[in-house]
């Protein structure tokens, strides 16, 4: 409850914080400039690092978190290319990249110079981060 409250206090009133399960949360930011994503991620990372989570009986704990973020639509010139669920899959790829490359960081993924042209390209985009980066479908930002 403390972590979700910290997230809700970090976002704007119209934004939505959802628990996906376990320790994963989804924040939906409405009408947001992609540059704001990285600012918000930095703010959340700082707040989590400095927050004393109350364990009861006088004990506290400091935590860190990892963040994966993407704008939606991911491809502004092709807003229907990915479904909302596929956008979440791409954000999940970013999250796992952050977790597997040091934790306590945010990884942002943006549209790359080569938008996917075929359905199998879209499938690769949402399941294989390395291939999506190599083929220019995505870029880290």
Residue ranges and their predicted role:
Residues 3-8, 36-54, 88-92:
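Alpha-helical scaffold within the catalytic cores of cyclic-nucleotide enzymes
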Residues 16-19:
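A short pre-motif secondary-structure segment
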Residues 21-22, 58, 102-103:
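A short glycine-centered flexible hinge/capping loop motif at secondary-structure junctions
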Residues 28-37, 56-60, 66-87, 113-115:
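Catalytic strand-loop-helix junctions within cyclic-nucleotide turnover domains
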Residues 30, 138-141:
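Bacterial c-di-GMP phosphodiesterase EAL domain
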Residues 38, 72-103, 107, 117-137:
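Catalytic-core segments of nucleotide cyclases and related cyclic-nucleotide turnover enzymes
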Residues 62-64, 140-141:
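A structural micro-motif at secondary-structure boundaries
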């Amino acid at each position: 409850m403390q972590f979700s409250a910290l997230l809700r206090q970090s976002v704007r009133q119209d934004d939505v914080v959802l628990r996906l399960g376990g320790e994963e949360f989804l924040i939906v930011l409405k009408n947001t400039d992609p540059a704001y994503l990285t600012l918000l991620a930095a703010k959340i990372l700082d707040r989590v690092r400095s927050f004393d989570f109350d364990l009861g009986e006088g004990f506290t704990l400091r935590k860190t978190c990892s963040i994966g973020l993407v704008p939606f639509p991911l491809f502004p010139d092709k807003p229907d290319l990915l479904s909302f669920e596929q956008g979440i899959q791409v954000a999940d790829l970013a999250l796992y990249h952050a977790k597997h490359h040091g934790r306590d960081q945010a990884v942002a993924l943006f549209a790359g110079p080569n938008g996917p042209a075929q359905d199998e390209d879209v499938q690769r985009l949402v399941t294989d981060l390395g291939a999506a980066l190599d083929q220019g479908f995505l870029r880290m930002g």
